[in-house]
Swiss-Prot record:
This is Growth-regulating factor 8. Predominantly expressed in shoot tips and flowers. Transcription activator that plays a role in the regulation of cell expansion in leaf and cotyledons tissues. Component of a network formed by miR396, the GRFs and their interacting factors (GIFs) acting in the regulation of meristem function, at least partially through the control of cell proliferation. GO terms for biological process: DNA-templated transcription; leaf development; regulation of DNA-templated transcription. The gene is GRF8.
Length: 493
């Protein structure tokens, strides 16, 4: 037999084997509380409160009562048998209690209970325990001679157990505040190292290393009354660390505002803030992205070559509108390219139609042009690959042609040699200035004058330029200087 709050109660094993005798009368009705100890469902609550009820409640139309014996206050009292413990009702014979005709309960042992008087509706306990009224209320005995039977802590424990029983009888979930008892007086709990003695009770406060300073564990040991053990972990009143909304995301903005979304199952944050705590990946950039980036750069360069640019020196006109560009050989004018090639293939036929004086000059021109054929082909290929160079070159040509005046224009003679009747071949042979004088070449009806606004070497498809003409063709007018001509041909070759 153990003690709870100074009141003995029977163990579970004893009560499980005990058979409760019901009264012979139909009026007696007994409600057995499960083994005198309320055990909550572990699956639903998972919390057990330490302690038990030191008294039972009997529902009966008559004023029935159950009082457990207390042998600690009366050492001469022997413990009764298990078959006669815990409960008694009207009409049940028991060695502890006797029922009088006026329904007042007296004890067979002298000195424990006194009659409540005839017609009394309550049981008056002479020993300083408590009294139960007909309404079910429990009141403390006010016997000043015997003194207080319960301490303040014991009385609060009885009140808590009575409230738990009311919730259970009403089939209502018991609040967690009642299941986990906390001391109501926190004034003496501020210092955990202080041992206090209050009403015969020792209160020991122990701190654990793995708990915060605001958490403390109370161990209350009742020594004077035979003892009750109460264990519980409580937090101080000033520290409210409990999360009132555990289903809510715990991500805050650093101040007082909190995310309103629900957390992911088994997580602390919502879907939006779950990635905040994850480490960021350091993936390398894929090669496909790099290749596409280079391709974009190349296409951008090609697009810039196709843009129409304007220059202020040409009065805001686009380059494509300048007439000098149409005379330049480029990739877009294959006729000029083939015309230059035909000039080399049919040079013999063209020279045969000229007079002897003109043939000598043309042969010198053709000799130098053969050596420059490779450079001419390279120039065409270079212009096909880089069309921007053609545009810049055309801009320079237009600038030179606009800056020149009619007095300084150079006159050139362009010979048009007709080959076969089915194919017309035009070869422009340019004769430029040599020594500041105007060269005049005698010819036949095949030559004609063509005047341009710019230098003749810019419009001619014949390679060589003004340098080849000045070195070779300029000395052809002096027939006596044969050595000079030969040296010019050797230098040009």
């Amino acid at each position: 037999m153990r003690m709870l709050l100074g009141i003995p109660y029977v163990d579970k094993s004893v009560l499980s084997n005990s058979v409760l005798e019901r009264g012979k009368q139909d009026k007696s009705k007994l409600l057995l509380v499960d083994k005198c100890h309320y055990e909550l469902d572990v699956e639903e609550r998972k919390e057990d409160f330490v302690g038990g009820f030191g008294f039972g409640v009997v529902e009966n139309s008559h004023k029935d009562v159950m009082v457990l014996p207390h042998h600690h206050y009366y050492p001469s009292y022997s413990s009764p048998s298990s078959s006669s413990l815990c409960y008694c009702s009207a009409g049940v014979s028991d060695p502890m209690f006797s029922v009088s005709s006026n329904q007042a309960y007296t004890s067979s042992h002298s000195g424990m209970f006194t009659p409540a008087g005839s017609g009394s509706a309550a049981v008056t306990v002479a020993d300083p325990f408590f009294s139960l009224s007909s309404s079910g209320e429990m009141r403390r005995s006010m016997n000043e001679d015997a003194g207080a039977a319960f301490s303040e802590a014991q009385w609060h424990e009885l009140e808590r157990q009575r409230n738990i029983y009311k919730y259970m009888m009403a089939s209502v979930p018991v609040p967690p505040e009642l299941l986990t008892p906390f001391p109501k007086n926190h004034q003496s709990n501020t210092n955990p190292d202080v041992d206090t003695y209050r009403s015969g009770m020792f209160s020991i406060y122990a701190d654990y290393k793995n708990l915060p300073l605001s958490m403390w564990m109370t161990v209350t040991v009742a020594v004077a009354t035979g003892g009750s053990l109460q264990l519980g972990i409580a937090s101080s009143a000033s520290n409210n660390t409990a999360d009132l909304e555990p289903w809510r995301c715990k991500r805050t903005d650093g101040k007082k505002w909190r995310c309103s979304r629900n957390v992911i199952p088994d997580q602390k944050y919502c879907e939006r803030h779950t990635h905040k705590s994850r480490p960021r990946s350091r993936k390398h950039v894929e090669s496909s992205h790099q290749s596409s980036h280079h391709n974009d750069i190349r296409t951008a360069k090609n697009d810039t070559s196709q843009l129409v640019r304007t220059y202020p020196q040409f009065y805001g006109q686009p380059i494509s509108q300048i007439p000098v560009l149409s005379t330049l050989p480029s990739a877009s004018s294959p006729y000029d390219h083939h015309r230059g090639l035909r000039w080399f293939t049919k040079e013999d036929d063209a020279i045969g139609t000229l007079n002897p004086e003109t043939q000598e000059a043309v042969q010198l021109k053709v000799g130098s042009s053969r050596e420059l054929k490779r450079g001419f082909d390279y120039d065409l290929n270079f212009r096909q690959k880089e069309p921007i160079v053609d545009q810049s070159f055309g801009a320079l040509q237009g600038l030179l042609s606009l800056n020149q005046t009619p007095q300084h224009n150079q006159e050139t003679r362009q010979f048009v040699v007709e080959g076969k009747q089915d194919e017309a071949m035009g070869s422009s042979l340019t004769l430029s200035m040599a020594g500041g004088g105007m060269e005049e070449t005698e010819g036949t009806n095949q030559h004609q004058w063509v005047s341009h606004e710019g230098p003749s070497w810019l419009y001619s498809t014949t390679p060589g330029g003004p340098l080849a003409e000045a070195l070779c063709l300029g000395v052809s007018n002096n027939p006596s200087s044969s050595t000079t001509t030969s040296s010019c041909s050797r230098s040009s070759s």
